[in-house]
Curated annotation (Swiss-Prot):
Annotated positions binding Zn(2+): 574, 578, 676, 680
GO annotation terms (biological process): alanyl-tRNA aminoacylation
HAMAP family: Ala_tRNA_synth_B
Swiss-Prot/TrEMBL domain comment: Consists of three domains; the N-terminal catalytic domain, the editing domain and the C-terminal C-Ala domain. The editing domain removes incorrectly charged amino acids, while the C-Ala domain, along with tRNA(Ala), serves as a bridge to cooperatively bring together the editing and aminoacylation centers thus stimulating deacylation of misacylated tRNAs.
Assigned EC number: 6.1.1.7
Organism this protein belongs to: Synechococcus sp. (strain WH7803)
Annotated protein name in UniProt: Alanine--tRNA ligase
Cofactor: Zn(2+)
Length: 891
């Protein structure tokens, strides 16, 4: 029996990238899946440089190394892949950054249910015609083939068996593995079902991959059934957007094309008028802009190592392709702004990290531009000699002297039909390594590179900060002004590694301690370093600050003193965070889990999984409950125990966090028990007071509460009281009368707004009377396309309808304008069509929606009257010209 399809109408089906993402997650959430947030692009898995697949955050669960958060889950995971970076922009579907939609079963449902849901989602929710779909199965997976054919009802000719290379997944040479089944979209179903070749990328696109983890492979290669079978699936968001938005490639979807338009505007070009080379450059800029923005947001900084090198390479490719398009001024910040604006609704952390992102983009672009021009000139001189290839020595000179990445040299050489002598390059590189090693010189290290270098050869730092706030220690290593060093003097920015420390290193959401390092046994004039932050590199604690007086050197003994006031505030906020999670579980939902946190000296922030907003009444009860626990003066109990014992005792662990076999348990008896390595008060009474500042949503299914505790509460209340007093003075009202005064003012503004809108509508209609004379005859029809600024959407609709009424059944009226001429970021477009125009096959809703895309927007409405909007006022004139041209051609 075939699986039934949904009756959802075309209008109700998702189209935009955001709608597709939400529809996918909602579909599986409705079927019992726990909606999980996207993990960072910087993975917990030390064997992987970046998050490359939607299943990566769940890999420890699939491998039996971590408990499952729920029987099944769904997510939209940020991913980065750079293994085929040379294909980005040249093919329809290759990207560096992309989102992978997925549904996962951890020993819950299996093959048949996964297949049925995949088909229901594809044909029902997304409305794909089964005649346009082809499925692949592993060559030996008779069960999957039978389900597709007999249960789902797929035409047997459209079920293709594939080899192990294409349709079998394994976690490694040994371990969990299983067959795959994929769903492909057929862009040319008219070619028939005979001889289907899924390698034909022009005809087929794979958009949904189902992995059935059903076996364990031993060292002999023998497969045995797994006790708990799992499901791992992945649907490319960009690919589904291409299919549903009916565009020729992923780049022209609403997920990327606004960035291409932003780059084209910077270059002063029209994407659709460019040759393939120009389009490729715009696609590279659009793709890489998303990638670098997300990488920086997740904490990656440009460097010459690891993921930092990937970021640097992507940034430099953007600059390079910008120059190919004629952009000779810095523009990375502008692309960063555009990327944040495009993606922040789905990824709110981008707006929170905006300043960091833009600063890194500006800094790295400036650094590259300083050397790029000289490097390009040298390469041009090399190419002018018309060599048969670029020698390894020449490529290395560009890399070593001018900071020119080898990949960039290869790209430019390829554009001229040349190759680069890679073997010669490696020889020159190795010779340089040997010279550097002999001279003991580290070249072009960023601060993080330098810290990584010095920390790599050191033993773990012994942390004694739970018991004491002062400690004498030996300096193990120094980084001075971004370089490994043996000594430092007054004025130097330093990172100090000690063998023993009382300073807490940032971790578990809690920021690192502040304090001082002084010459051992001295004070006052003996002050050496003001410690501003403490971080961890693996288990090596790095104390960052600036030398105030004197000098220090590797091997010196210093005395560390933690700032007691800062530590007390951090402790109060951290314990308050535990109480907050306990109160949320008690008052809102016992299943609430932590999604992230920040414990600083002056505030706390707690992110948690919750499908709805916490009500004002619930927040009031939570606040009261926490202050009650504080007043009850609970003495905290802290102990170390085996993780199995801790979990059996009910200790709360954070999903995604890695724990050792022995863990530290912080217990507020009868209230809260959590696995935690942070610092805490000895008694809840030390917190003093707790006050919630705000509750908000930060992502789908993720809520955030911000609060203050302890010494930070009184300044917060004083600040609020000052605001109330200022409002009272402004409104000439007592505090208790302010709400009444504001409500009256809102009512007055609302009435004034209505009157203004009515006046604008009347004015627009009056203006339109003069426009009617500008209508031109196109056969039996009257065509009028005009610009009318300073009128809102309601007024523009009224004007268009008035003009259509005047011009009769053959009227085709299109009006566009900027409601506020000073704001180029808001465009209004309206179409009004008479009965004869509609009978000709034109519909105002579809027509104006298409025109609005030229202004970076969209919209629609009824066949006779419709409105759309856009974000690019500079494109309005060309959009109106396009509207006139299209109507002249079709009428």
């Amino acid at each position: 029996m075939a699986v039934a399809r949904s009756s959802r109408t075309d209008a109700a089906r998702p189209r935009t990238g955001a709608e597709i993402r939400d529809a996918f997650l909602a579909f599986f959430e409705e079927r019992g899946h726990k909606r999980m947030p996207s993990a960072s692009l910087v993975p917990e898995d030390p064997t992987v440089l970046l998050t490359i697949a939607g299943m990566l955050p769940f890999k420890p669960i699939f491998l039996g190394q971590q408990e499952r958060p729920a029987p099944c889950a769904t997510s939209s995971q940020k991913c980065i892949r750079t293994n085929d970076i040379e294909n980005v922009g040249r093919t329809a579907r290759h990207h560096t950054f992309f989102e992978m939609l997925g549904n996962f079963s951890f020993g819950d449902y299996f093959k048949q249910q996964a297949i049925e849901w995949a088909w229901e989602l594809s044909t029902g929710v997304f409305g794909l015609d089964p005649k346009n779909l082809v499925v692949s199965v592993f060559r030996d997976d008779d069960e999957a083939e039978q389900i597709w054919r007999e249960v789902v009802g797929v035409n047997p000719k459209r079920i293709i068996r594939m080899d192990e290379e294409d349709n079998f997944w394994a976690s490694g040479p040994t371990g969990p593995c299983g067959p795959c089944s994929e769903i492909y979209y057929d862009f040319k179903p008219e070619l028939g079902d005979d001889g289907i070749d899924l390698e034909d990328d022009d005809r087929f696109i794979e958009f949904y991959n189902l992995v059935f983890m059903q076996s364990n492979r031993d060292a002999e290669g023998t497969l045995t059934p797994l006790a708990n079978r799992n499901i791992d699936t992945g649907m490319g968001l960009e690919r589904m957007a291409q299919i549903l938005q009916k565009v020729p490639n992923n780049y022209e979807t609403d997920l990327i094309f606004p960035l291409i338009q932003a780059a084209a505007e910077r270059a002063g070009v029209d994407y659709h008028q460019l040759d393939e080379k120009g389009k490729t450059s715009l696609k590279v800029i659009g793709d890489h802009s998303r990638a670098v923005t997300q990488l920086i947001s997740d904490g990656v900084t440009a460097s010459n190592l690891g993921r930092g090198y990937i970021l640097r390479r992507l940034l430099r490719r953007v600059v390079r392709h910008g120059r190919l398009l004629g952009i000779d001024k810095p523009f990375l910040q502008a692309m960063g702004e555009a990327s944040i604006a495009l993606m922040q609704s789905a990824h709110p952390q981008l707006s929170e990290r905006r300043e960091v992102i833009l600063a890194e983009l500006q800094r790295e672009e400036a650094r590259f531009l300083e050397t790029l021009e000289r490097g390009e000139k040298l390469l041009a001189d090399v190419l002018a000699a018309k060599p048969k290839q670029i020698s390894g020595e020449q490529a290395f000179e560009l890399y070593d002297t001018y900071g020119f990445p080898l990949e960039l040299t290869q790209e430019i050489a390829e554009e001229h039909g040349l190759a680069v002598d890679l073997a010669g390059f490696e020889t020159a590189m190795e010779q340089q390594r040997q010279r550097a090693k002999a001279a003991a010189v580290s070249i072009d290290l960023t601060l993080q590179d330098a810290i990584d270098q010095v920390a790599a050869g050191l033993q773990d730092t012994e942390f004694r900060g739970y018991e004491q706030l002062e400690q004498s220690s030996s300096i193990q290593a120094l980084v001075v002004n971004g370089e490994p060093a043996q000594s430092a003097v007054a004025g130097d920015a330093v990172q100090v590694v000690l063998d023993v420390t009382p300073f807490y290193g940032e971790g578990g959401g809690q920021i690192g301690d502040r304090g001082t390092l002084v010459a051992d046994g001295q004070a006052g004039d003996g002050l050496i370093v003001m410690v501003e932050s403490v971080s961890r590199n693996r288990s090596v604690f790095v104390h960052s600050g600036r030398v105030q007086r004197g000098a220090l050197a590797v091997g010196d003994v210093v005395h560390g003193r933690v700032d007691r006031a800062c530590r007390r505030r951090a402790q109060a906020n951290h314990t308050a965070t535990h109480l907050l999670q306990a109160a949320l579980k008690q008052e809102v939902d016992p299943g609430i889990g932590q999604a992230g946190s920040l414990v600083s000296f002056d505030r706390l922030r707690f992110d948690f999984h919750c499908p709805r907003a916490v009500t004002a009444e619930e927040l009031e009860r939570i606040e009261s409950l926490i202050n009650g626990w504080i007043a009850d003066a609970h003495a905290l109990e802290v102990q170390e125990m085996a993780i199995e014992k801790a979990k059996a005792a009910g200790a709360v662990a954070m999903f995604g966090e890695k724990y050792a076999d022995v863990v530290r348990v912080v217990d507020v008896p009868g209230v809260s028990m959590e696995l935690c390595g942070g610092t805490h008060v000895a008694n809840t009474a030390e917190i003093g007071l707790f006050k919630i500042v705000s509750e908000s949503g930060v992502a789908a299914g993720i809520r955030r509460i911000e609060a203050v505790a302890g010494a930070a509460v009184l300044p917060y209340l004083n600040e609020r009281d000052a605001v109330v007093k200022q409002l009272g003075e402004r409104f000439k009202a007592q505090p208790g009368e302010i709400i009444e005064r504001v409500t009256a003012l809102q009512d007055e503004l609302k009435a004034t707004g209505k009157a203004l809108a009515a006046a604008q509508a009347e004015l627009a209609v009056a203006k339109s009377a003069a426009l009617a004379t500008k209508a031109v005859a196109v056969g039996d029809f009257q065509l009028l396309v005009e610009r009318l600024d300073g009128v809102d959407g309601t007024g523009l609709q009224g004007a268009a309808q008035s003009l259509a009424d005047q011009l009769g059944d053959g009227a085709a009226v299109v009006l566009g304008g900027l409601p506020d001429p000073a704001d180029q970021g808001k465009v209004i477009l309206v179409a009004a069509f008479g009965k004869a125009v509609i009978a000709q096959g034109q519909q105002a809703g579809k027509f104006i929606g298409g025109i609005a895309k030229l202004c970076g927007g969209g919209g629609g409405g009824r066949p006779n009257l419709a409105q759309a909007g856009g974000r690019d006022g500079a494109a309005l004139a060309s959009a109106l010209e396009a509207a006139s041209h299209q109507l002249r051609e079709s009428l």
